[in-house]
Structures are given as structure tokens and as C-alpha cells.
UniProtKB/Swiss-Prot annotation:
Compartments, as annotated in UniProt: Secreted; Cytoplasmic vesicle, Secretory vesicle lumen; Perikaryon
GO CC terms: cytoplasmic vesicle lumen; extracellular space; neuronal cell body; perikaryon; secretory granule lumen
Keyword terms, alphabetized: Cytoplasmic vesicle, Glycoprotein, Phosphoprotein, Protease inhibitor, Proteoglycan, Secreted, Serine protease inhibitor, Signal
Protein's recorded name: Neuroserpin
Stated role: Serine protease inhibitor that inhibits plasminogen activators and plasmin but not thrombin. May be involved in the formation or reorganization of synaptic connections as well as for synaptic plasticity in the adult nervous system. May protect neurons from cell damage by tissue-type plasminogen activator.
Alphabetical GO biological process terms: positive regulation of neuron projection development
Family stated for the protein in its record: Belongs to the serpin family.
Keyword Phosphoprotein applies: yes
GO-annotated molecular function: serine-type endopeptidase inhibitor activity
Species per Swiss-Prot/TrEMBL record: Rattus norvegicus (Rat)
Amino acid sequence: MAYLGLLSLVALQSLVTGAAFPDETIAEWSVNVYNHLRATGEDENILFSPLSIALAMGVMELGAQGSTLKEIRHSMGYESLKSGEEFSFLRDFSSMVSAEEGQYVMKIANSLFVQNGFHINEEFLQMMKMYFNAEVNHVDFSENVAVANYINKWVENYTNSLLKDLVSPGDFDAVTHLALINAVYFKGNWKSQFRPENTRTFSFTKDDESEVQIPMMYQQGEFYYGEFSDGSNEAGGIYQVLEIPYEGDEISMMLVLSRQEVPLATLEPLLKPQLIEEWANSVKKQKVEVYLPRFTVEQEIDLKDILKALGVTEIFIKDANLTAMSDKKELFLSKAVHKSFIEVNEEGSEAAVASGMIAISRMAVLFPQVIVDHPFLFLIKNRKTGTILFMGRVMHPETMNTSGHDFEEL
């Protein structure tokens, strides 16, 4: 079973008192964010939700006008759409992927925390409700300890205590007037489970050639699989792509793995929306031996740095035009935090065909082996639309098992 969760914090400050969403748009945004994160953290794990960021930016876009609005639309890749058309797409897509029963659970929630007595335009509130089903809560940000506790409690209640301490009292002060919280989490059972009795300790080789011992899951079954060339014409120039579906076949995890002797950093520059689409269209269902680490990761990302790097700058300065949100002048974005987690383990709702542990061997076999014992890239995506829900990479799996979450309570 895999669990993913995400929260984005957007706090705003005033100086006066102190169908289906186009998948190529989300894919382009996903790749841009990923490239920024890998450039700023060369040897770090990465995890984020392009969908959650798009929803948070959608709320900000609703409140923007003039050059601030134009800047957001350009950065998000919405210029080819009619003005405001993206809001309907975001609403329809979030409604489509949200599910609380059946084969998987995915929830998306938005809440706007507003300073007591602070005026927010009624039309903006109505549009927030219509497009993002957002709720509004009034608080006193000068009571920063109480506000932090209140928001964290809201987060915990929404995620069944999976995510805690998203914000701290230091995130708020007397001049903070608005905080936007966007929460997304996903829980899915593998269509074909990894049997726990087949999990064994195994070596994971990092890009610096050091090794760590990790729990390695195993199963043999039919999955979507393909081999692709990185264009180098070298012996290690072929890399593997494996797609593992969750129950119901609507959502899947796509794993991208270079040959063991080839660092992931060699493969990452190739990453483009068109290549992701090629992977999805080219993998074929066949019998595969899969060795996949059991891992958990929780990561907090400063969205402010990312958004600035991708061209969104005006919302962070006093000249920001957020007059569609409020008539109050000099309102700007002061803090944006993106927090996410993922757990991947053996659980699923169907029994696996494989029986007993098979020793790992790199000798010739009758069907492909995918041995994920070195750094890899992964995507969680909607198989119908191709839209990327979560994206990341695993460089250090040993750091991914210390989050302390009790995922069984979800």
C-alpha cells in the first residue's frame, strides 16, 4: 500500500497595518519544479505534488489582477487557455481524482484562514467555494500560538493525524492577514500486493558507490514495462521504466531506473513532458520480476524560492496586485510551504501470484528483472489523463523510514 499526503501553506501579509485538465500543462509544470529542486539539492531526496501546487496557485490567481495575474498565468502555462478557463479545468480535475470509496482514497481540501475583521471580497469567496470548495475560518493572527495550534489541528483532523506541526507560531504575526492551507492525500492498495514474507534485507548502492541495507520487497507478476535509450550508445545507456498499478487501474506508480553503473543524474536531464508521455505510451504489459525498496519519505519545500525561480515574483512584493481578493492595498504573499509524505510498502488487496523468496540474480532470465537497488525517479499519475499527482526521486532510502507516522490509522 502506498500513502501520499501533502499540505501547502500560503500566508499573506499587509503593509497597511504592518473536463480533464490538459495533462501537458501539469507535466510541464512538474518537470520545471523537479529540475529546480534537483539543481538546488544535488544529492537529496525529492517529493512534491504538482497537483497541490497548481490548486494553491489557482486560489492565488483568483485573487490576482493586472501584471500579477499575467505573471502567474505565464508561469503555470495557462496562456494558451481562455482567461479563467483554467479554474474550470482545475475544479473538474480535482473532482475527478477525488475519491473516498472504492479502490483508492484521494482527498483534496482548501481552507482560507482570515484575520478577524479583515475584509475579503465576497465574489472572491464565492469563486473559491465554486472552483476549489474552499472553506473560510476567521482567526486572530496576533495570537500566533493559538492560530498555529488551530491550523495544525485542522490539518491533523483532515489527514487523520498523518501530518502534524505544519505551521509554527513564528509563521504568523500581527501583520499577517491571510493564510491559505491546501491539503491533499492519497491512499492506494497495489493491484497485486508484495507478500511481506518475501521482503528481505538487501544492499542499496548510492550514486557515490556507498551502500546501505534496506528492506527489499519482491514479487513476480504482469506489469507495464519498457526499456529506453538515453541516446549515449554506451553499454549503460539503456534504462528501465516500470508501471505498477493501484487497485482499480486508475492510478499507478511509474518507476524510472538507470542501469546500476549509471548515476541518476545522467538520466535526469532527459526529463521532459514529451518523454513522460512516451514512457506511458510505450510500456507493454508483460511478466516482470520486481524488487522494490520499502520506503517512507516526508519533505518540506520552500515554495517561495521555487515560484520565484519559475517567474512568479510580484505576489511576494508590496506592489502585488491582489485586488480581486481584497480592496485593501499592499497585500502580498509572505510565506509558502509545501509539505508532503509517501509510504510504499507491501500491502494490497489481492494475493500475489508469486510464492516464496527468489534469490536476486542478474543472470539471464526468461523475463525482465527490475531491481531497484540504486537511486530512481518515480511518478504517481492518473492513468486515464496522464496527469502527474506526485513526483520525486529516492537517493537515500535509509532516511525515509523515520517519519514516525502510524499510517495504519488512515
